[in-house]
Amino acid sequence: MAQALPWLLLWMGSGVLPAHGSQPGIRLPLRSGLGGAPLGLRLPRETDEESEEPGRRGSFVEMVDNLRGKSGQGYYVEMTLGSPPQTLNILVDTGSSNFAVGAAPHPFLHRYYQRQLSSTYRDLRKGVYVPYTQGKWEGELGTDLVSIPHGPNVTVRANIAAITESDKFFINGSNWEGILGLAYAEIARPDDSLEPFFDSLVKQTHVPNLFSLQLCGAGFPLNQSEALASVGGSMIIGGIDHSLYMGSLWYTPIRREWYYEVIIVRVEINGQDLKMDCKEYNYDKSIVDSGTTNLRLPKKVFEAAVKSIKAASSTEKFPDGFWLGEQLVCWQAGTTPWNIFPVISLYLMGEVTNQSFRITILPQQYLRPVEDVATSQDDCYKFAISQSSTGTVMGAVIMEGFYVVFDRARKRIGFAVSACHVHDEFRTAAVEGPFVTPDMEDCGYNIPQTDESTLMTIAYVMAAICALFMLPLCLMVCQWRCLRCLRHQHDDFADDISLLK
């Protein structure tokens, strides 16, 4: 998952409380989209919606509200494995490609996959090891029959990594026992020959090659007895559900089929452009990853964004640890000053040449509510934007504002305003466009690739240079050896003469 699972850092400080989890809150009727200064010329919308194939759009009642989770600990769906079926909760992760489940006792697991009890399990006699920035897991590969009770009415034979050992992978109290990697085969472990679950699903059934996610997040409940309420959402497999979003869907191309990589062309804080080379936003990639909690930004972009957010919210002072995600800030219940925090706009490459669209993110998304703090009279939050060394990661806190369509068949990702996102009476999340943005292709970061033929050429050149320098040296050594030999022979002859005397 871009690839690290979310972990909560616990710190103490003056007037600052340690972070633990989340408390939900106000959900008001959605108003019109957020206004703001357009980027360049704003063009008319060509069509309200693009035509879709039959079966791609419609109502998927059986799949609505099939996700559960806890704030900062991921969203999971119920799945069954084996014969007879064993039910497990599986984390939905668009930032990895392995379907992996706990298959041995673990202190944080209430249940696990028992391969020996399944008559349909097949052992592939192959191991797999997956390290993360923090944590790792390893296990054994096999296949078994898999279905999703609140999903399409199909059963598929899928590759399963049975996790036998792990470190800092499972989360205590998260209520999930495995991970469903929904990205492409290129990043599957141990290699890209291992077919991911969604590829198997599409190949073995008539399910269309797309899925969509509505992650609803958590605000604060009016009833404090609901403070431990789970987050929820929907994973629509094989289609798009109209009831889960408002307005139009806007699509950005999938740049490369490994992670769900996209191109960000501009970033604004409260309408003010960060004015950075757009390559910086995508260094070394930008991905959409439901398995990561935060919006993660490359170092330079993170520093510029935090500087702008600090300036916009300067009416209140916050400790440095807050901006690093290590400390919480709290206000008396119901008094959070949302208005002092700016909105963040990410402009994404559009499908039409030189056109982009923007998604606008509210502070209710990037300030993540946490639960179980020392005093229940306060609303406490963690700053959910963090620094990344592996590019931009649009994690769950971003996705919670939008209905996101992973249209694998057309190599594109769609965004629309989610019908369940948390907001206030003054501002809502927004998806707006099109905007004129030239030379967007230049914004993508190209990882330097050196093939074997290039390496061989370099090796030959280096060998030739070495030979060129070594040749005179070799000649000098040979000449020295010859002279030494002649001198040695002369000395031997002189010694013989002296003996004869």
Curated annotation (Swiss-Prot):
It is found in: Cell membrane; Golgi apparatus, trans-Golgi network; Endoplasmic reticulum; Endosome. Residues 22-457 are extracellular. SUPFAM superfamilies: Acid proteases. It is an enzyme of class 3 (hydrolase). PROSITE patterns: ASP_PROTEASE, PEPTIDASE_A1. Residues 39-58 are annotated as: Disordered. Residues 75-416 form the Peptidase A1 domain. The modification Phosphoserine is found at residue 498. A lipid is attached at residues 474, 478, 482, 485 (S-palmitoyl cysteine). There is a cross-link at residue 501 (Glycyl lysine isopeptide (Lys-Gly) (interchain with G-Cter in ubiquitin)). GO terms for cellular component: axon; cell surface; cytoplasmic vesicle membrane; dendrite; early endosome; endoplasmic reticulum; endosome; Golgi apparatus. It catalyses: Broad endopeptidase specificity. Cleaves Glu-Val-Asn-Leu-|-Asp-Ala-Glu-Phe in the Swedish variant of Alzheimer's amyloid precursor protein. Residues 22-45 form a propeptide. Residues 1-21 form the signal peptide. GO terms for biological process: amyloid-beta metabolic process; membrane protein ectodomain proteolysis; proteolysis. Keywords: Acetylation, Aspartyl protease, Cell membrane, Cell projection, Cytoplasmic vesicle, Disulfide bond, Endoplasmic reticulum, Endosome, Glycoprotein, Golgi apparatus, Hydrolase, Isopeptide bond, Lipoprotein, Lysosome, Membrane, Palmitate, Phosphoprotein, Protease, Signal, Transmembrane, Transmembrane helix, Ubl conjugation, Zymogen. PANTHER family: ASPARTYL PROTEASE-RELATED, BETA-SECRETASE 1. Belongs to the peptidase A1 family. DXXLL motif is required for a proper endocytosis and retrograde transport to the trans-Golgi network, as well as for regulation of lysosomal degradation. Responsible for the proteolytic processing of the amyloid precursor protein (APP). Cleaves at the N-terminus of the A-beta peptide sequence, between residues 671 and 672 of APP, leads to the generation and extracellular release of beta-cleaved soluble APP, and a corresponding cell-associated C-terminal fragment which is later released by gamma-secretase. Cleaves CHL1. This is Beta-secretase 1. It comes from Bos taurus.
